A protein has these predicted regions:
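Conserved ABC ATPase signature
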Residues: 144-148, 152
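Helix N-cap at the start of a conserved alpha-helix in ABC-type nucleotide-binding domains
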Residues: 180-182
Length: 256
């Protein structure tokens, strides 16, 4: 069953720059999809159209059977409760502790006052610690986030996302700021979350080798258009060159 559908989506910035052109695809529940393409190809714009950080100029985005491209602010807030977001630069509150940042994943489910006062239930706190334990961070729970390494910060971002209990997790270049060893840890965690928790994942990646190893499906973008949509084992060197105008060897980042 399709969890997400793009139907003829276009996005034009400032009435001149076409970021997306007639994008059409669907994502079923449980898929692990990697979107690849050079900088400026439209990868981030696709994710932003899903969670309505930007509005599509034309076309329709359906998420969980609801048209979110034309939704009210209230309906957008409801949709965002089901969509976790993991950012390249973590988007954490550095002065707060790890556990506080993870609990922020529940803010969308609380009133403004409860959120501001940090009113979390004991079951929510217990769940946050369980998630941190699975991600190997429980010993860091009371550390400020600005004391963590980049890989640890990204795991906090993953934990916060899981805390939302999302149907979909969007990852915008989640390993771009990490060394190869930390990148592998992050990708392994995301893969395990997808398999074991049955959460659909869509990742924007520059690293072709990472997409080939982890994704069940790859979407290739060039100049705002889809030029490949299929399984990793059908992605040929010629198609990679078409996507990037570069050879496969130049796009390898050893994270095995």
């Amino acid at each position: 069953m399709a969890l997400l559908e793009f139907q003829g989506v276009c996005k034009i910035y400032n009435n001149t720059t076409k970021a997306l052109a007639d994008i059409a695809f669907s994502v079923d529940e449980g898929e692990f999809v990697s979107i690849i393409g050079p900088s400026g190809s439209g990868k981030s714009t696709i994710l932003r159209c899903i969670n309505r950080l930007v509005d599509a100029t034309q076309g329709t985005v359906i998420f969980d059977e609801s048209d979110i491209s034309h939704a009210s602010k209230k309906d957008i807030r409801e949709a965002r409760k089901k969509i976790g977001m993991i950012f390249q630069h973590y988007n954490l509150v550095d002065r707060l502790s790890v556990i506080e940042n993870v609990l922020h994943g529940r803010l969308g489910h609380k009133s403004t006052i409860s959120g501001m006062m940090g009113r979390y239930t004991e079951s929510e706190k217990e769940k946050a610690f369980q998630i941190l334990e699975k991600l190997g961070l429980v010993e860091q729970a009371y550390k400020r986030c600005d004391e963590l390494s980049g890989g640890q910060k990204q795991r906090v971002g993953i934990a916060r996302s899981i805390m939302q209990e999302p149907k979909l997790i969007l990852c915008d270049e989640p390993i771009a700021s990490l060394d190869p060893s930390s990148a592998k840890v992050i990708m392994d965690h995301l893969s395990n979350i997808n398999r074991n928790m049955k959460i659909t994942c869509i990742l924007n990646l520059h690293q072709v080798d990472v997409a080939l190893k982890y994704a069940s499906r790859i979407i290739g973008l060039t100049s705002g258009r889809i030029v490949y949509d299929g399984p990793p084992n059908h992605l040929t060197k010629n198609k990679i060159y078409e996507i990037y105008q570069s050879s496969e060897g130049e796009l390898i980042t050893d994270v095995w």
